[in-house]
Every structure is written in structure tokens, then in C-alpha cells.
Amino acid sequence: FIGPPLTPRYVTQSNLINYEYQLYIANLRSAPLRFGFMVADKADPDRRLFSVDTLFDYLERDGFSRTVQEWHFNACEFDGFWLKDCTVVEAKGRYEQFLDSDNGPKYHFVEKGIFSPWNAQMTRQKAAISIAGHQAQLSWFFMQVRTMAAATRFAGLDPLICKYEPYPGEVG
């Protein structure tokens, strides 16, 4: 089914491009299904109290925040589902800022904090769709080539599942 993410995630001005990319990938071949932005619950009190995004939520959305719809299957979340292809999809947007000029982690937290959890996520997703048999597919899409290369290298992601798909208008 299509629904909100189980863990709180909020669209802000600074991460908007990642969510736009997620919806771009989710809707590439999802017809007749359609994924979009949706109103989340009241703004999370743990969010930064004086951020511009929180202020905008209160002034323009009566305290409600935006999030995106995701595909839920077998107790697992995916960024989208392509019905005709029986393919669940995951999208990874702008992560290149965490890589140095040699395509290594720019900061000490990057490998363990960003890339390593992706391996667990991919493993969970593969297990979730296994009950659907061989017709079920999982594809991960990356907006940036360097991010995809780093993810397969540092997180050990399955390179057969990873694909580069630039976002229209973005330089990858």
C-alpha cells in the first residue's frame, strides 16, 4: 500500500531535491499508481525550534509538515513500486557532498553513518520481496555516479541492483 514513512521524515528546503528525486524515480514507471508529497502529522517538537522550515510549517501549513508517500510491502518500506514491472525502487539523491576528491569519505562518520546502513536497508528489502518469487525485482537508483560508486564500495551494495539515473536538469 501507499502511505507515509513509518519513521518521521520531513521535507525541508535543504533536502527538497532528495525528495523530488525520490518521487521522480518512484513515478517513472509506477502508473497507474502515483506517489507524491503529503501532509505529515503536526510538526515534530524535536525539530529545531527556530528553523525557517519549522516557522514556515506553522505559518503556512497550520503547524503541519510535508513528507512523501512510500510503498509498504511485507513490513518494509520502499520509495516506490512499478506495478507492471513488479519492481520496488529506492532512490538516493545528493550524497556527493560527503565524498572527498578521491571518492573516499570526506568525514569520519560518512562510511558508518551513511553508507553502511544502506547495506542493511538493501538486505531488508531483498528479504521482504523474496516471498513474491522471481518476478519481484529491487532496483536502487542514484542521482550521482560518484555516490553510486561509493555505495557499492563502502556499503557493499549489490552492483547489479544499483543504477545511475540522473535527475533532469541536474549535473551528476
Q: Residue locations for each model-derived region?
A:
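Acidic-basic catalytic patches of nuclease active cores, encompassing PD-(D/E)XK
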Residues: 1-77, 83-84
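Short, structured coil/loop segments at alpha-helix boundaries
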Residues: 3-19, 29-30, 46-49, 107-111, ...
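Conserved phosphate-coordination/catalytic loops
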Residues: 71, 112-120
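Conserved catalytic cores of phosphodiester-cleaving nucleases, focusing on short active-site segments
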Residues: 79-82, 86-100, 125
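A solvent-exposed, charged loop/short amphipathic helix patch at secondary-structure junctions
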Residues: 94-114
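Active-site or metal-binding loop neighborhoods of secreted/extracellular toxin and effector enzymes
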Residues: 119, 123-172
